[in-house]
């Protein structure tokens, strides 16, 4: 995480125009970001805005994802192969890839296998000299199980690395396209360690990506300059500015006045305004996500299955989607998105039935009701474009069956930290796919192991469910995996650790003269943007 000292150092690092001077020319693009980054190292970050500001601008990974097919394609690795037993993966690395430089460091060599080993071992090895730098928790690395899965990572030569696994894993390749798998410079890390400033690799990042960090003013702006040696072709827009704008209405106002040229996650109620302005354009992409309310199953009354089932029946999901999502979403019934491998189409759902909810609550001994807290997210997401409104509608639904829900919210970082610790009774949350694999939902969000890491917000541990998802990740055959996930979803439905609410399309808006910007599993790609 950043410190006050770090913020000051970054803010005073460059004699550049003031934050208000964001006029864009043909070589400057302004993006209205939703929030300040937690860190410029995606290995130790966990929020979407942090990943957009770091991994998707400053770094690359071994693989990328095809934006249409969502399948792995080469990036820093040009090819790969796996042994017949599925336990040994060998990657061939791209030659001629240069790292950026900054005022503390100028690289003397190109990207090679040493950088891959450093980026992996920092996260895996508790005795690595960088493991505890910046208080790194490496949440994603642990959530996908790489700390236990990887037995050994070896440098064969400068342009070949080999991973030896403890067991086969169907999602292993896709994991190396995730944000946390960004490749950092081992040479830079060594230099900063010798100078006694190891934290600089996280606050003054050096990567192989399309842009380099130039300036950061906390809660105000981030300035980047194009990488003149970018391996994937010339970057058309030389200057990129993130204008940090948490308020969704302010973001639209800035887009209308050309103070920024791209905004993420406009509210559905803003769609008519955007569509009605010839200078603006509204864009959408199909997304792999799910929004949900998680019951803390370790706390009363949600440790009682009857209560969880009752409140599923008490919640009018159709009304929520109609009122809040408008054209941007559809009702969800599974933890796995509908357009993903393993989704069970015939999975039943809880229909809106307040009387059935009352009957179940009576069986649970709560005929007189109960009081609980309902945490509401402070940010907008495709799977939850207006958390406060959704929370209020759920609060109203529950009140009809005798459950009084007190809505609370916190700053985003505090919200995430509190959920990881299990401080909530119930909480609105959601997930967007990191790698296109069903384990990223069924395992990451609901496995017993991930109660400890914090991504299992329901803190639900069901041994039969857990066994099924652990078996599924070992299987390479898609049909066999789908059967296992179908069985797991049946248990999920019966045990009701969540109220699955909705899946939402990813929307963003631009000035009409913007071209080349894309959004995919990898997030935002600024490397081809042009201002026409």
What are these regions (language model features)?
Residues 32-84, 121, 128, 206-208:
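N-terminal lobe/hinge region of extracytoplasmic solute-binding protein
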Residues 92, 124-125, 129-189:
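Surface-exposed binding/hinge segments that line
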Residues 211, 331-364, 381-389:
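Structural transition elements
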Residues 199-202, 227-273, 284, 391:
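Ligand-site clamp/hinge motif
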Residues 35-52, 76-77, 103-107, 172-182, ...:
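A structural "hinge/loop" feature
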Residues 26-29, 53, 170, 217, ...:
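Detector for C-terminal structural segments
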Residues 225-228, 285-310, 314:
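A bilobed periplasmic-binding-protein/Venus flytrap-type ligand-binding module shared by bacterial periplasmic
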Residues 78-129, 162, 254, 301:
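Aromatic- and charge-enriched surface segment that lines or borders ligand/interaction sites
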């Amino acid at each position: 995480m950043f410190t006050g000292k770090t913020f000051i150092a970054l803010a005073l690092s460059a004699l550049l125009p003031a934050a208000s001077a964001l006029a864009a020319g043909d070589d400057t693009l302004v993006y209205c970001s939703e929030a300040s980054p937690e860190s410029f190292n995606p290995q130790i970050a966990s929020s979407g805005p942090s990943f957009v500001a770091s991994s998707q601008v400053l770094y690359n990974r071994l693989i990328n994802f095809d934006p249409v097919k969502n399948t792995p394609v080469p990036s820093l690795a040009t090819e790969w192969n796996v042994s017949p037993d599925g336990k040994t993966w060998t990657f061939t690395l791209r030659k001629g890839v240069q790292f950026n430089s900054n005022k503390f460091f100028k690289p003397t060599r190109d990207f090679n296998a040493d950088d891959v080993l450093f980026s992996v071992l920092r996260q895996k090895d508790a005795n690595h000299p960088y493991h505890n730098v910046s208080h790194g928790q490496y949440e994603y690395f642990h959530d996908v199980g790489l700390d236990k899965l990887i037995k050994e990572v070896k440098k064969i030569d400068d342009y070949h690395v080999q991973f030896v696994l403890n067991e086969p894993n169907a999602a292993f390749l896709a994991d190396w396209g995730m944000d946390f798998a960004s490749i950092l410079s081992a040479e830079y890390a060594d230099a900063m360690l010798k100078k006694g400033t190891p934290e600089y690799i996280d606050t003054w990042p050096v990567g192989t990506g399309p842009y380099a960090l130039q300036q950061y003013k906390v809660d105000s702006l981030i300035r980047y300059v194009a990488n003149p040696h970018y391996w994937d072709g010339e970057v058309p827009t030389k200057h990129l500015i993130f204008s940090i704008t948490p308020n969704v209405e302010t973001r639209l106002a800035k887009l209308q006045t050309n103070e920024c040229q791209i905004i993420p996650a406009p509210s559905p109620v803003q769609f008519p305004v955007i569509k009605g302005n010839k200078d603006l354009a509204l864009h959408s992409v199909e997304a792999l996500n799910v929004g949900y309310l998680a019951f803390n199953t370790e706390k009363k009354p949600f440790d009682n299955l009857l209560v969880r089932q009752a409140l599923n029946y008490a919640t009018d999901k159709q009304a929520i989607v109609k009122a809040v999502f408008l054209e941007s979403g559809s009702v969800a019934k599974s933890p796995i998105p509908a357009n993903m491998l393993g989704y069970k189409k015939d999975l039943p759902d809880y229909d809106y039935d307040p009387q059935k909810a009352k009957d179940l609550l009576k069986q649970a001994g709560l005929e007189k009701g109960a009081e609980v807290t309902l945490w509401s997210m402070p940010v907008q997401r495709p799977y939850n474009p207006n958390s406060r409104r959704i929370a209020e509608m759920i609060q109203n639904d529950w009140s009809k069956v005798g459950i009084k829900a007190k809505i609370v919210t916190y700053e985003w970082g505090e919200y995430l930290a509190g959920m990881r610790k299990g401080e909530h009774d119930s909480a609105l949350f959601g997930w967007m796919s990191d790698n296109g694999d069903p384990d990223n939902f069924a395992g990451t969000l609901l496995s017993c192991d991930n109660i400890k890491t914090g991504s299992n917000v329901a803190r639900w541990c069901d041994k039969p469910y857990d066994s099924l998802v652990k078996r599924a990740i070992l299987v390479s055959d898609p049909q066999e995996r789908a059967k296992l996930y179908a069985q797991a979803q049946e248990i999920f439905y019966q045990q009701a650790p969540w109220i699955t609410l909705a899946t939402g399309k990813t929307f963003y808006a631009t000035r009409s003269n913007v071209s080349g910007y894309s959004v995919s599993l990898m997030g935002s790609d600024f490397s081809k943007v042009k201002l026409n």
